[in-house]
Regions:
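Generic cytosolic/nucleocytoplasmic N-terminal low-complexity/intrinsically disordered segments
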Residues: 2-3, 40, 93, 118
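C-terminal helix-to-coil terminal segments
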Residues: 82-134
Length: 134
């Protein structure tokens, strides 16, 4: 149940939404969070968009919802097994598929470039890297 701007569950939010946009991070806690129950609540006029992480979507449930008309359409910019996209998505006319370009803005690319230079500088100066990958 949603009261004012606060929903008790993702299903409750989907039920009152026309468009559900996922910007969820990756990780075990978000695996298949967008599942058959959420999609059923979104309903036959609902649109699902994912620009977060592919692991958050139960692909089988979304494909079935799109095929059956349980959900109107989907726009996907991320996938569980990038760069492979499930074949079923490619056969559906109510899906728009993008090649993970949701972050392709001038500002984001500039920030990425600056981060590279900041890490190179830190490395050469024997300082702590800004975004060290272990």
């Amino acid at each position: 149940m949603c009261i004012r701007d606060s929903c008790q569950s993702l299903e409750d939010l989907a039920e009152i939404s026309d468009i559900l946009v996922s910007v969820l991070p990756g990780g075990a806690e978000t695996d298949n969070l967008i599942n058959a129950n959420v999609l059923k609540k979104l309903g036959p006029s609902g649109v699902f968009i994912n620009v977060g992480r592919g692991n958050s979507v139960d692909d089988e449930a979304l494909i079935e919802a799109l095929r059956s008309g349980a959900v109107r359409a989907a726009g996907l910019d991320v996938y569980k097994s990038e760069p492979q996209i499930p074949d079923a998505y490619q056969t559906l006319e109510n899906v728009i598929l993008l090649p993970h370009i949701g972050s392709a803005t001038v500002e984001t690319r500039r920030a990425m470039g600056n981060l590279v230079f900041d890490n190179i500088r830190a490395f050469l100066e024997h300082d702590t890297l800004v975004s060290e990958v272990m």
